[in-house]
């Protein structure tokens, strides 16, 4: 088995790479994927988003090591084990990120990845329905749209933000991210529109693209060059040969794991694991970043939430409506309004994100109270805490060791306390007078810094946005793993292209920037001239230095 390009992973970036690298028909591509089919209602029905993440069939099911600042809880760290990777099990929320995120990337050594450089790739990949004209793509493979927005609670949330003095944005993925607005989702015609739907399936219709179901054990490196991938399938170990390059797109947990198993990483750690050191790159597995969030839940005094649909019978009705007619509650992920806010005067870009949900519920679908309710998922998105990923052993099938080191920076506590108090201010606005009942969580007795900190230690969870473990940077940066053209430093014929190469976490959900990374990396791999830089200037709040709104 051989191809010009061998891609490890069919997720957000890997699928985009397969599509673009094979586009002109001159290059052969093999995609290696361990996970199975993404066909079925648990994945394809947007409202069923909680199901695939809870199923071992679709999820690698990783857990962090005990987190010392979170009562030593082991935090769930899901990654997609299915065609389409995590884009097939995620919440389908589409957020490009803020312009300052990508300008920061360039400042950190990722030359050519500033906002002006990446905006054309966002436009190339998007098929936006109703986005801001001139700022959005309209004929790309990735369908992006808003939900039906039929529930009055969505509108109450946006109106409450206006009453509190915050900005409103008509398109947070356009020129102006900051403010309250309607949330976008990667759905189309009532179905999840994953990277597999947008990129991989069209690519697999080409004669020069092949998908191989297998377990990738390590990258084969000969005389300083990646020549293939050692795989296991059907109980046999084989090698898939790469005539040109191997591209690792296996997630922020498995991409560094594969590099280390192949002898690329911190020399001392590799020796400890009994692995021959091919290239000493101390940054492999370091710089792990993530977003955290908690659920702020409130009783609704009016029977307008989704609570009535939680009994099994009504879930079955919603499922049948979706299955046979592609209509009803099943066609949306139910995250249909949102906010992107700045935490304080002097903060230039939004750093607090809200997902609003018209029901008070846990992620597994259980009601938080025996009543109608509503909630926000809220978190501080620019944490300075950093973790790492390392090997548990030299066994390729052993789970990686994941240490997030959540809440290890003092500023995180200050910002999350502010999130609690700010949410109370928003839910206290006149727009919620018709609906506001008792506070379910954190609870009205949780008021002091100490009480809020206690709540956070027990209830903060991952937003499932890990990144940064194969950092992109300048070649002379000792902690960089790949250069700005996504080439692994010190090895020929090997690249990494997924969220693991982000030098710094972006503001918002990571599916969109991960796909963009695949799109842009494809041009680097093919030696093409990058798309022309944009000269569009995004909106920055003129009051940012003196006001938080």
Curated annotation (Swiss-Prot):
Pathway this chain belongs to: Amine and polyamine biosynthesis; betaine biosynthesis via choline pathway; betaine aldehyde from choline (cytochrome c reductase route): step 1/1
Cell compartment(s), UniProt: Cell membrane
One annotated GO molecular function: betaine-aldehyde dehydrogenase (NAD+) activity
Protein name per the record: Oxygen-dependent choline dehydrogenase
The organism's taxonomic lineage, starting at the top: Bacteria, Pseudomonadati, Pseudomonadota, Alphaproteobacteria, Hyphomicrobiales
Record bears the keyword NAD: yes
PROSITE patterns reported for this sequence: GMC_OXRED_1 (PS00623), GMC_OXRED_2 (PS00624)
Any GO CC annotation of this UniProt entry: plasma membrane
Species this protein is from: Rhizobium meliloti (strain 1021)
Catalytic activity from the UniProt record: choline + A = betaine aldehyde + AH2; betaine aldehyde + NAD(+) + H2O = glycine betaine + NADH + 2 H(+)
Gene: betA
Keyword NAD attached: yes
Binding residues annotated for FAD, in chain numbering: 4-33
GO terms for biological process, alphabetical: glycine betaine biosynthetic process from choline
Protein EC: 1.1.99.1, 1.2.1.8
């Amino acid at each position: 088995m051989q191809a010009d390009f061998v891609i490890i992973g069919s997720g957000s970036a890997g699928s985009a790479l397969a599509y673009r690298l094979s586009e002109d028909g001159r290059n052969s591509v093999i995609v290696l994927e361990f996970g199975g089919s993404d066909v079925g209602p648990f994945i394809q029905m947007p409202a069923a988003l909680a199901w695939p993440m809870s199923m071992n069939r679709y999820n690698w099911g990783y857990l962090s090591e005990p987190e010392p600042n979170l009562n030593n809880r082991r935090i769930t760290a899901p990654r997609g084990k299915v065609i389409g990777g995590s884009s097939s099990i995620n919440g389908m929320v589409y957020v490009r990120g803020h312009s300052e995120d990508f300008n920061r990337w360039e400042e950190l050594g990722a030359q050519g990845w500033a906002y002006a450089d990446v905006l054309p790739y966002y436009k190339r990949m998007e098929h936006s329905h109703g986005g801001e004209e001139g700022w959005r793509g309209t004929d790309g493979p990735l369908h992006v749209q808003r939900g039906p927005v039929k529930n009055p609670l969505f509108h109450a949330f946006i109106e409450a933000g206006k009453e509190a003095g915050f900005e409103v944005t008509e398109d947070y993925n356009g020129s102006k991210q900051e403010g309250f607005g309607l949330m976008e989702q990667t759905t189309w015609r009532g179905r999840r529109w994953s990277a597999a739907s947008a990129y991989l399936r069209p690519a697999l219709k080409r004669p020069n693209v092949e998908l191989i179901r297998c377990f990738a054990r390590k990258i084969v490196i000969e005389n300083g060059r990646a020549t293939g991938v050692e795989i296991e399938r059907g109980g046999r170990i084989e090698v898939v040969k790469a005539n040109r390059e191997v591209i690792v797109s296996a997630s922020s947990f498995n991409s560094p794991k594969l590099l280390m198993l192949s002898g690329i990483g911190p020399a001392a750690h590799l020796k400890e694991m009994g692995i021959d050191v091919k290239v000493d790159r101390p940054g492999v597995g370091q710089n792990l970043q993530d977003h955290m969030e908690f659920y702020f839940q409130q009783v609704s005094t009016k029977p307008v939430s989704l609570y009535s649909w939680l009994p099994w019978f009504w879930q079955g009705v919603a499922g049948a409506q979706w299955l046979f007619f592609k209509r009803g509650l099943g066609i949306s992920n139910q995250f249909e309004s949102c906010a992107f806010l700045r935490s304080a005067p002097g903060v230039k870009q939004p750093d607090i994100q809200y997902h609003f949900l018209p029901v008070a519920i846990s992620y597994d679908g259980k009601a938080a109270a025996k009543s109608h309710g509503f909630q926000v998922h809220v978190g501080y998105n620019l944490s300075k805490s950093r973790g790492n990923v390392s090997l548990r052993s030299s066994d390729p099938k052993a789970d990686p060791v994941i240490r997030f080191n959540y809440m290890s920076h003092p500023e995180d506590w200050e910002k999350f306390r502010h999130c609690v108090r700010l949410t109370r201010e928003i839910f206290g606005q006149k727009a919620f007078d018709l609906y506001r009942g008792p506070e379910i969580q954190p609870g009205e007795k949780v008021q002091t810094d100490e009480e809020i900190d206690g709540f956070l230690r027990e209830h903060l969870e991952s937003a499932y946005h890990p990144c940064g473990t194969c950092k992109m940077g300048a070649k002379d940066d000792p902690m960089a793993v790949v250069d700005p053209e996504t080439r692994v430093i010190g090895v020929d014929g090997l690249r990494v292209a997924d969220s693991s190469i982000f030098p710094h976490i972006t503001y918002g959900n990571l599916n969109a920037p991960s796909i963009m990374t695949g799109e842009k990396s494809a041009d680097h791999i093919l030696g093409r001239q990058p798309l022309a830089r944009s000269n569009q200037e995004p909106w920055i709040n003129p009051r940012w230095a003196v006001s938080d709104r």
